[in-house]
């Protein structure tokens, strides 16, 4: 993974939902939707019910060309050094 991509990990109590490179991620935050791009400032935020959207990175782009979505009831996200960790 180069500096042009984020590494996204989404976990639930049952399983790892996604673990791989992405171009961007869009979240349902308590104060409204927000998007995380490469080199985003470090944050920790709570998430509300809604839809997480993300575009797969170059390594997976040939297989998954569309924007991927995941419906959640809530959770938390941490962003640090281009790694995005989500617990839903």
What does each model-identified segment do?
Residues 1-5:
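Short, charged, intrinsically disordered terminal tails
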Residues 6-88:
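Compact, glycine-rich, soluble single-domain proteins
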């Amino acid at each position: 993974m180069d500096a042009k991509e984020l590494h996204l990990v989404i976990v639930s109590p049952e399983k790892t939902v996604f673990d791989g490179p992405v171009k961007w991620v869009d979240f349902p935050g308590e104060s409204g939707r927000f998007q995380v791009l490469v080199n985003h400032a470090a944050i920790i935020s709570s998430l509300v019910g809604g839809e997480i959207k993300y575009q797969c990175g170059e390594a997976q782009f040939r297989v998954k060309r569309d924007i991927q979505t995941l419906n959640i009831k809530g959770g938390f996200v941490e962003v640090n050094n281009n790694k995005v960790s989500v617990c839903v």
